[in-house]
Swiss-Prot record:
Its EC number is 6.1.1.3. The gene is thrS. The lineage of its organism: Bacteria, Pseudomonadati, Pseudomonadota, Gammaproteobacteria, Lysobacterales. Zn(2+) binds at residues 335, 386, 512. Its cofactor is Zn(2+). This is Threonine--tRNA ligase. One of its GO terms (cellular component) is cytosol. One of its GO terms (molecular function) is threonine-tRNA ligase activity. GO terms for biological process: threonyl-tRNA aminoacylation. It is found in: Cytoplasm. Belongs to the class-II aminoacyl-tRNA synthetase family. It is an enzyme of class 6 (ligase). Residues 244-535 are annotated as: Catalytic. It comes from Xylella fastidiosa (strain M12).
């Protein structure tokens, strides 16, 4: 007998091995119809057809469960393959993973796919779903899978199988009628679960992500548990399109990118004002938190990067240059340079913690196809800081950083913060005791701050665990920004030492920390978060003064000078245009305040105040308006 325990504590007994679907049927036909997969003993997910061969705790997964989304999306990727092979038999399927909010499938085809092809593929998927067919899984011997894909000419599937170790002797093959694909699963048992999907776009990709390899075509899509969720997501996409930082950046004359410098940003005066405002804000954070700001070279001999480990683990993403028979690397990260500053002199344990901060310009050789406006670039500047401390000081330093980070995010208008701890991976440096201490220190720091967090087992770097800060923006998208990372490796590799209380030389712990991360990416996120409607303290132009007629010319100049003297960013519009035209133009430019001056304002020494949201605040004295502006300044 096999006993299956359900989440409510009830038990069902079966005479022998039983599938998830059979258990669902035993409970009731309604549950069976809704069953997508199962979770065994609170751990891994299995297909509805998989047999349970021992006593187990079973949770049946339905579309109501969060886990169902990934299964639905992965199954939709296979459905893309089914549709593509019916429409374009010569195409060769590569991989089709799940990504945030959706999925994609990479395909090799000599024939470039067009938007019309995308629509045809989507329509064929709808037709296949309407057939309401079962998705059938067979565990198949490796040699039979090889034979199957050879017969079908699926060269990329064969290459993927070649990459698998010899221990893989069998694999799951999922049958969508005549179409087959391999996967660990689980997948939906029937196409009726795939109705709420949409194909969104086509882009280019490279086999194994290497530009030296053949180019593939990537079909992106999204899938949800029901039509309502799909419609809500598509609405969010429309909202995101309106907030696209590239469009707003062009409309507000903030920055541009061009072909001669892929992934490198040209900042225009207005955009640079925003940059400098954020930089000055972060500089104040450095100063108030005991950081010494420094500046390190842009290029360093490769010998340093070999010592740091970047050469072995990161050289494919680095830029190099040669001079006088020496090879230099353009820095992709700032940390090795900060260690060099620390090493200039021997430190006592009494000196620790030592905190360094830098607006460090870095360059990384990102694939051209991955570049995306300000959000993915090759040249970027980080608010990069490093703390050299003892193991006993980790908790206090992390606690201080956490409080500092939350205040920064609040000042920029982010209140919904998710916190995650990435824990030790299987392959790692350092002993288990050091990892125990580091992970315990991160947990203790967050506990002291009375916040909740999610733990991510196995997702820490090989040199230490880290805390990640994920921020939700105005339309519900999540962005990973800040991190604080414990590093046991680099101080030792680069010879960083201090003298402890027993006069012994020891390597300090190094904490890598950033609050906003890449300044370019952060500004891109802010543009989309605010939809270009900047808070007054960040706005490149905070106030525009507009006269009604030439009779107010001199008075408008006086107001302009008075506000400039107070340190505000002010423009003046004295053009011979109708005041309505001026108001519309500056409102569209999202200038926070427009001050209109006519004869009445000139006579009374006031200004008529309007906001970019078209709110009329009436007449104010200049001093009253200055006071209002000052209350809105963060820096």
């Amino acid at each position: 007998m096999i006993t299956i325990t359900l989440p409510d504590g009830s038990r069902r007994e079966f005479e022998g091995p039983v599938s998830v679907m059979q258990v669902a049927h035993a409970i009731g036909p309604g549950l069976a119809k809704a069953t997508i997969a199962g979770q065994i003993d609170g751990g891994h997910l299995v297909d509805a057809s998989d047999l349970i061969e021992h006593d187990a705790i079973l949770r049946i997964i339905t579309p109501e469960d969060q886990e169902a989304l990934e299964i639905i999306r992965h199954s939709c990727a296979h459905l893309v393959g089914h549709a593509v092979k019916q429409l374009y038999p010569e195409a060769k399927m590569v991989i089709g993973p799940v990504i945030a909010d959706g999925f994609y499938y990479d395909i090799y085809s000599k024939r470039p796919f067009t938007p019309e092809d995308l629509a045809a593929i989507e329509q064929r998927m709808v037709e296949l779903i309407a057939q309401d067919y079962d998705v059938v899984k067979h565990i198949t011997a490796r040699h039979d899978v090889v034979r199957l894909f050879k017969e079908r000419g699926e060269d990329y599937k064969l290459r993927l199988i070649e990459d698998m170790g010899p221990e893989v002797t069998a694999m799951g093959i999922y049958h969508h009628q005549e179409y087959v694909d391999m996967c660990r699963g689980p997948h939906v048992p029937n196409t009726r679960f795939l109705k709420a999907f949409r194909l969104t776009r086509i882009s280019g990709a490279y086999w194994r992500g290497d530009t030296k390899n053949e180019q593939l075509q990537r079909i992106y899509g999204t899938a949800w548990a029901d039509k309502k969720q799909l419609e809500a997501y598509m609405q969010r996409l429309q909202d995101a399109e309106k907030r696209d930082h590239r469009k707003i950046g062009k409309a507000q004359d903030l920055f541009h990118l061009q072909e001669e410098g892929p992934g490198l940003v040209f900042w225009h005066p207005k955009g640079w004002v925003i940059w400098q405002t954020i930089e000055n804000y972060i500089r104040r954070v450095y100063r108030n938190s005991g950081y010494g700001e420094l500046r390190c070279p842009q290029i360093l001999d490769v010998s340093l990067w070999q010592k740091s480990g970047h050469w072995d683990n990161y050289k494919e993403n680095m830029f190099f240059t040669d001079s006088e028979k020496r090879t230099y690397a353009v820095k992709p990260m700032n940390c090795p340079g900060h260690v060099q500053v620390f090493n200039q002199g021997l430190h006592s344990y009494r000196d620790l913690p030592i905190r360094y901060g830098e607006f460090g310009a870095c360059h990384r050789n990102e694939p051209s196809g991955a570049l995306h406006g300000l959000l993915r670039v090759r040249g970027f500047t980080q608010d990069d800081g490093h703390i050299f401390c003892t193991e006993a000081q980790i908790e206090a330093e992390v606690t201080a950083f956490h409080r500092q980070a939350l205040q920064v995010y609040a000042d920029f208008g982010f209140e919904n913060i998710q916190i995650k701890i990435a824990l030790r991976p299987d392959k790692r440096l350092g002993d288990s005791l050091s990892w125990d201490k580091a992970e315990a220190a991160l947990r203790a720091a967050l506990s002291a701050c009375e916040v909740e967090w999610q733990e991510l087992p196995g997702e820490g770097a090989f040199y230490g665990p880290k805390i990640e800060y994920h921020l939700k923006d105005a339309i519900g998208r999540t962005w990973q920004l800040g991190t604080i990372q414990v590093d046991f490796m680099m101080p030792g590799r680069l010879g960083a030492e201090y003298v402890d209380e027993r006069s012994q030389r020891r390597h300090p712990v190094m904490l890598h920390r950033a609050i906003v991360g890449s300044m370019e990416r952060f500004i891109g996120i802010l543009i989309e978060h605010y939809a270009g409607i900047w808070p007054t303290w960040l706005a490149p132009v905070q106030v525009v003064i507009a006269n009604i007629t030439d009779a107010q010319y001199e008075y408008a100049e006086q107001v302009h000078k008075a506000l400039l003297n107070q340190g505000f960013r002010v423009n003046i519009d004295l053009r011979n245009e109708k005041i309505g035209y001026k108001i519309r133009e500056h409102t569209l430019q999202r200038v926070p305040y427009l001050l209109v001056v006519g004869d009445r304002e000139k006579e009374n020494g006031t200004v008529a105040v309007r906001t970019c949201s078209r709110e009329d605040l009436g007449a104010m004295s200049i001093s009253a308006f200055v006071e209002r502006l000052q209350t809105e300044q963060v820096v």
